[in-house]
Amino acid sequence: MGLTSNKVLALAVLAAVALFVATIRLWPRLSHRGRRAVLGRVGLLLATQSAIFAAVGLAANKSFLFYGSWADLLGREQEMGVVVDHSASSRTVKVVGKQRPDVPGGARPETGGQIHKVVIVGERSGIDSPAYVYLPPEYFQPAHASRAFPVTVVLTGYPGTAENLITGLEYPRTAFMQAREGRMRPMILVMLRPTVAPPRDTECADVPDGPQTETFFAQDLPAAVAQTYRVGTGPRNWGIMGNSTGGYCALKIALHHPGRFAAGAGLSAYYKAAEDPTTGDLFHGNQAERRRANLLWSLDHRPQGASSFLVTTSEQGEGNLAGTREFIRKVKAPARVSSITLESGGHNFNTWRREIPPALVWMSGRLGTG
């Protein structure tokens, strides 16, 4: 049974409940003086509390995927990666592995699609970043052999792991199910974290004498994917979305590069670049770039292109409600803005899982095929 399986979590909860009941029933017998009684009380308390902490820890890990397996938890996951050469590779996208999506018919690409584990080589930025590429089943079907597919870049928060987009937030499975049910058109997902120069949080900026992260996302990544896969190359074929830091980056890239991305979606996004010990000095005193990294300032002082934006927040539980409302007020034609406002939510996977299905449907409606 895997670390994140429902069976393990259920067993932990049952053990905690059983020990709690046992403590209540046995406590009168152990209320006497004497070493045995004292040791019995201490043992029951330790066992019950350990079981409760284990259940809570397993539930938190299942939600946030801090560790993916028992070996990962115990520090035994040390096997080196193996580079695999595949025909899908190009000069700027190296395919190093393939895997089945967790969907019905996932064993066959033409019925379940396929996920490629890749390394994207940034020729202009000099950044190489790992990523996952989800190809929908239609990509492998003869009837669509000449079709160019729309692409959505999907970003995690900081520091994030790209694997969480697959196993935790279930982007490929959600896209597959929404397309199968006719709610959205099939699209390719390029999934990665915004931390392309770890451990630094660059806030998707081109840092002077540092990582050129904005260039990587706005120029290198679209060019690399277009060289490797059957995708459209116009702005109407490309969208970008993410949660938290990834949401800020998605809105920023779509706002500043409408000639590349027709749509940007920020789930629980913030609207001004963070500046803290994880980011370091992003602007080196360049106030123009600091202002440009403030999306609310940019909406007021820079031309707005024809991109569409989706922003999400909650009436209770999230700290970006006021900023989101201000962002909505400031978007002007030809740009467009839509929103999702939950009654209550938080800065967590559970909230984003509620927003991802409608966000993907929204994104599909803004993008076209090549």
Residue map of PLM features:
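Non-catalytic cap/lid and distal C-terminal segments of serine-dependent acyl enzymes
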Residues: 1-370
